[in-house]
């Protein structure tokens, strides 16, 4: 399984997203309870602009592992793209609760609040 994740990650680094999705899907089919395979595929869906599929996979990650702070941070990114700013802020707050020393939630929450201000002007 680790070999599949490594292969998929290499494909992502080469921007071969469709092939990476296939590899991560294979890992999911082999072990549908392995949260990290779902999270990797969610990341590739995000990178390829398929935010709805990314969110669906993130939901599965959090169903399997509710404290997966990486998935919560990814959920924040997805919700920014979907302009669901309040949901994005909540995702980052949850990530920060789980991993208090994580720096990105504070940075992203500040940026989201700026986006909200810009839209109300």
Model-derived features: positions:
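Alpha-helical segment of the N-proximal tetratricopeptide repeat
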Residues: 2-30
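TPR/TPR-like (Sel1-like) alpha-helical repeat modules
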Residues: 77-114
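Conserved structural position within tetratricopeptide repeats
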Residues: 26-29, 59-63, 96-97
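Position-specific recognition of the canonical hydrophobic site in helix A of tetratricopeptide repeat
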Residues: 5, 12, 39, 45-46, ...
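Structural signature of tandem alpha-helical TPR/SEL1-like repeats
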Residues: 13-23, 47-60, 82-94, 116-121
């Amino acid at each position: 399984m680790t070999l599949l994740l490594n292969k998929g990650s290499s494909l992502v680094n080469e921007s071969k997203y469709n092939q990476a999705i296939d590899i991560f899907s294979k890992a999911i089919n082999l072990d549908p309870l392995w949260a990290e395979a779902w999270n990797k595929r969610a990341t590739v869906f995000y990178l390829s602009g398929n935010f709805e599929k990314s969110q669906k996979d993130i939901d599965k990650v959090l169903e399997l592992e509710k404290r997966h702070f990486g998935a919560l941070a990814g959920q924040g990114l997805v919700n920014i793209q979907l302009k669901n700013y309040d949901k994005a802020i909540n995702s980052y707050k949850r990530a920060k609760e789980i991993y208090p020393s994580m720096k990105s939630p504070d940075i992203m929450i500040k940026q989201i609040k700026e986006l909200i201000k810009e839209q109300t002007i």
